[in-house]
Amino acid sequence: ERELAKMIYDELGVQTKRDLEQYRASDHGDLIGLDGWTIEAKRYAHNAGGNFKPEWWAQVTSAANATATEPVLIFKYDRQPVKCVVFLSSINGEFAGKDNVATISFPTWCMLVREGWADV
């Protein structure tokens, strides 16, 4: 989580930190400080086909629903690039209300965040 917080700061200039409430209550992401997003971070040594586990996505969407924010699952397996999972509607609003997801690179997710700032 600290490594990811540094990556977010380096790319977006936003200071995020671990959400200690995640250990006391359900429906909390791993990092807080990036308005509009619930961030769940996962890192594992071995992958299962290089994809994310459905329970990881369920965890972050539950937390995002509780706070009315966009969920992002950011995961990394050893010797693999960081990947991000978002609702397709985060990329294209025409998919709003659907459960379709997209797996994108970390720089692409940062671009989505920056574009969201431009829309405000």
Question: What does each model-found stretch correspond to?
Answer:
Residues 1-120:
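Catalytic phosphate/metal-binding cores of nucleic-acid and nucleotide-processing enzymes, i.e., regions
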